Amino acid sequence: MKKISKFIISVIIFISFNLFNPIQKASAIGEVDWLLLKENNDGKEWVDLGSIRKIKDNEISVLTKYFQNPNKEKVKGETNLYVMRINCETKEYKDISVNGIPSFKAQWKTSNDDELIDVVIDKSCNEINT
């Protein structure tokens, strides 16, 4: 019983600290510079120009937003946020976070000629090189 009580108290303290931590709130607030890159029958793709960061020689990370147009499965459509890691030399990418949830097992892949992904890769790599 004592172990359960200690666990519950620890969880409450952890949640309270995260909810009421002014430093965390301040660092989470920031301006987003969304640029609509492309719109097609599948949806719309934006990139946050202020989020583009160089990681290694040919690798960058960038925050993107994708709105999937309504279809038979999703009547209202769906918006998702991705943190993409992009290799500008090979034009490969991996989604390292989706809607704030880390994807620890993300694998490098090509766009398979998806024009919305291609435009993100091209614009992001061009921005970091200018």
Place the predicted regions along the sequence by residue.
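Bacterial N-terminal signal peptides
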Residues: 10-19
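N-terminal secretory-pathway/extracellular module detecting exported/lumenal segments
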Residues: 22-130
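Bacterial N-terminal signal peptides that target proteins for export
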Residues: 1-11
